Amino acid sequence: MKNSELLKIIWALKNGEIIAYPAESVFSLGCDPDNDKTIQKLLTLKNRSWEKGFILVSDNYDKLTKYIDDKKLTKFQKRIISFHDTFFPRTWVVPAKKCVSKLITGQFKSIAIRISRFEYIKNICLNYGKPIISTSANISNDAPCRTKNEVAKKFNQCVRTMNGKTLGNFQHSIVQDLLNGYLYRKR
């Protein structure tokens, strides 16, 4: 990943733009989780209901504490969140702080989070200094984009797209409730 390209992605996030970037299985769309105006643009772009909420990805646990009600988590549960597996990513559903935008949590009192070591996500979050929203690069109910060219065809000039390749995983991350173990999405 070129440093100049990463700087353009960080600039886009700081200036309220939607970005597209390679993730573990598909290209993802993302934005600043503290910018409701941009989150609303993302919902519109994807034709997605706000009620579903979004996943936040980060390179480490500490950056997520602004959004997680971690007083409801044990030390062991916090360690579980911090474990990351690049090839088999897991998204955790955890209690959200009351101040988190409903555009992120949707109709829930919880928030979906994932810590990633995947090069592109890790570098974006490390250099941006906070987590970003992560949602598959697609219109709701359509197949997700797997390449930069597919993103360009589907979203034209609506997003700033990062060069790179996904890991090629054919399955999305497992989504699991950390408190009760419920699996929302399996492999």
Swiss-Prot record:
Organism for this UniProt entry: Riesia pediculicola (strain USDA)
One Gene Ontology cellular component: cytoplasm
UniProt entry keywords in alphabetical sequence: ATP-binding, Cytoplasm, Nucleotide-binding, Nucleotidyltransferase, Transferase, tRNA processing
Protein name: Threonylcarbamoyl-AMP synthase
One GO MF term: ATP binding
HAMAP family, A to Z: TsaC
Classification via Pfam families: Sua5_yciO_yrdC
Primary localization class, coarse: cytoplasm
Function: Required for the formation of a threonylcarbamoyl group on adenosine at position 37 (t(6)A37) in tRNAs that read codons beginning with adenine. Catalyzes the conversion of L-threonine, HCO(3)(-)/CO(2) and ATP to give threonylcarbamoyl-AMP (TC-AMP) as the acyladenylate intermediate, with the release of diphosphate.
Family note: Belongs to the SUA5 family. TsaC subfamily.
Localisation: Cytoplasm
Nucleotide-binding recorded as keyword: yes
Gene Ontology process terms (BP): regulation of translational fidelity; tRNA threonylcarbamoyladenosine modification
Broad enzyme group: transferase
Catalytic activity, reaction form: L-threonine + hydrogencarbonate + ATP = L-threonylcarbamoyladenylate + diphosphate + H2O
Cited InterPro entries: DHBP_synth_RibB-like_a/b_dom, Sua5-like_dom, TC-AMP_synthase, TC-AMP_synthase_SUA5
Top-level taxonomy: Bacteria, Pseudomonadati, Pseudomonadota, Gammaproteobacteria, Enterobacterales
Domain YrdC-like: 3-187
Keyword NADP attached: no
Record EC number: 2.7.7.87
